[in-house]
Amino acid sequence: MRPQQAPVSGKVFIQRDYSSGTRCQFQTKFPAELENRIDRQQFEETVRTLNNLYAEAEKLGGQSYLEGCLACLTAYTIFLCMETHYEKVLKKVSKYIQEQNEKIYAPQGLLLTDPIERGLRVIEITIYEDRGVSSGR
């Protein structure tokens, strides 16, 4: 759900956090641009949930090994008729972001963009101009 009528006033980019290596996780530091727009705890919870989902996607387990073996045995044609564990979790991420946008972010004039659309490099948050509320600028 996107606030269609309001013009874009800016964008905030939440960068990847490489402090624990190259696994996909994002910084939970609250950006100053979102002050008075969304609750700090709600923002941090959203990013933590996304980080947990990406950790689940990258987790190696029996299913991942089985997928790899089946891929080798079928010259990777198995993936034409089967979703990988990673793809299933990415769908969960997309659904979670859509729910967060509808329930929390869009009513506040914000829009989360799925990190997969930005190559898993950043979480983009679009800020729409306040509708009838002074932004203090």
Curated annotation (Swiss-Prot):
It is a lipid-anchor. The keyword Membrane applies. One of its GO terms (cellular component) is palmitoyltransferase complex. It comes from the Eukaryota. It is found in: Golgi apparatus membrane. Keywords: Golgi apparatus, Lipoprotein, Membrane, Palmitate. GO terms for biological process: Golgi to plasma membrane protein transport; Golgi to plasma membrane transport; peptidyl-L-cysteine S-palmitoylation; protein stabilization. Palmitoylated on Cys-69 and Cys-72; which is required for Golgi localization and interaction with GOLGA3. Its main location: Golgi. A lipid is attached at residues 69, 72 (S-palmitoyl cysteine). Interacts with GOLGA3. Interacts with ZDHHC9. May be involved in protein transport from Golgi to cell surface. The ZDHHC9-GOLGA7 complex is a palmitoyltransferase specific for HRAS and NRAS. Belongs to the ERF4 family. This is Golgin subfamily A member 7. It comes from Mus musculus.
